[in-house]
Regions:
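Short C-terminal tail/terminal secondary-structure segment
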Residues: 2-13, 238, 249-297
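Conserved glycine-rich cofactor-binding loop
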Residues: 27-29
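Short, small/polar-rich loop/turn modules that mediate ligand/substrate recognition or access, typified
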Residues: 100, 185, 190, 248-250
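Substrate-binding pocket helix/loop in short-chain dehydrogenase/reductase
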Residues: 110-111, 118-123, 218
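C-terminal substrate-recognition "lid" of short-chain dehydrogenase/reductases
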Residues: 131, 226-255, 260-261
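Alpha-helical segment proximal to the catalytic Tyr-Lys
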Residues: 139, 182-186, 246
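Catalytic loop of short-chain dehydrogenase/reductase
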Residues: 150-172, 177-186
Length: 297
């Protein structure tokens, strides 16, 4: 039964009808929001992650809203598990039209105090795992049918103090994106990336309470004077999966309010609240099930 979903997407209804799109890390944060928008546009969303409870909850939300979603528990750092998971998805659905490589994670640690184990864990999750999922989606489906891959990276331009492990992994994923776009173009596969800046997402809840004041102050380093929303990030992802981006490949779409362009000595003031409400920059939040991070509550 098809019902009208309450997600307020800016894209045309039915845009992705009939497509199977995999979203890793789809049980929370940006992945959860993106899964909802994709489903609202007609896609069958395949949620992938390590937490069955979160995946089940998101799949149930999508179903209640009239969409279609299934889920697979998988540790994307384990090569054999990824191969088996993708094979199962292809067997169930015939092909994979799109992949949102969203799974990731990091923790606050200066380089001098980062252990080799901690460094490797972040690299495995944010770089190696994404590579494995993309490779298997290509080898087992997209190589034969074409497709679109969107890798989620981060605002690591210039540096990423306190999270050097994540910055290195994300920079590696940008290079992977560019190389895969070249190597896989002959098979009709597009590969792009989205780099979220400071987004008010549930991912912020993973940081310790003492980081709260610092997180809240980060808005003052963004020229637009605010945090982005999950829905603003999701919209960028959907665009890159859509036919409108058919000639876009090998690029990184930043969703960051121009934060990397801030320069010492150049008018460090940010947009005031009244300016933030102007049509071209006012916050967009089409996600009807968005959850405010605890640090902002």
């Amino acid at each position: 039964m098809t019902t009208t979903t309450p997600y307020r997407s800016v894209f045309a209804p039915g845009l992705l009808r009939g497509q199977v799109i995999m979203v890793t890390g789809g049980g929370s944060g940006i992945g959860r929001c993106t899964a909802h928008e994709l489903a609202s546009l007609g896609a069958h969303v395949v949620l992938v992650g390590r937490n069955p409870d979160k995946l089940t909850a998101t799949a149930q939300e999508i179903t209640v809203d009239g969409g279609q979603a299934t889920w697979h528990s998988c540790d994307i750092r384990r090569e054999d598990d990824v191969k088996a998971m993708v094979a199962q998805v292809v067997q169930q659905h015939g092909r994979i039209h799109g992949l949102v490589n969203n799974a990731g994670g990091q923790y606050i640690s200066p380089l001098a105090k980062t252990s080799a184990k901690g460094w490797q864990a972040v690299i495995d999750t944010n770089l190696t795992g994404g590579f494995l999922v993309a490779r298997e989606c290509f080898n087992q489906s997209m190589q034969q049918h074409g497709g679109a891959v969107v890798n989620i990276v981060a605002d690591m331009w210039g540096s990423m103090p306190g999270m050097g492990h994540s910055g290195a992994a994300r920079a590696g994923m940008v290079s992977f994106t560019e190389t895969a776009a070249l190597e896989w173009a002959t098979q009709g596969v597009r590969v792009n990336a989205v780099a979220p800046g400071y987004i008010a997402s549930s991912g912020m809840d993973h940081y310790p309470p003492e980081a709260g004041p610092m997180l809240r102050e980060m808005r003052n380093t963004v020229p637009q004077g605010r945090f982005g929303t999950e829905a603003e990030t999701s919209a960028a992802i959907v665009f890159l999966l859509s036919p409108a981006a058919s000639f876009v490949s090998g690029t990184v779409l930043r969703v960051d309010g121009a934060r990397p362009q801030m320069r010492m000595g150049w008018q460090q003031a940010v947009a005031t609240p009244d300016v933030q409400e102007r049509d071209a920059v006012k916050p967009f939040d089409g996600f009807h099930r968005a959850v405010t991070p605890k640090v902002f509550q």
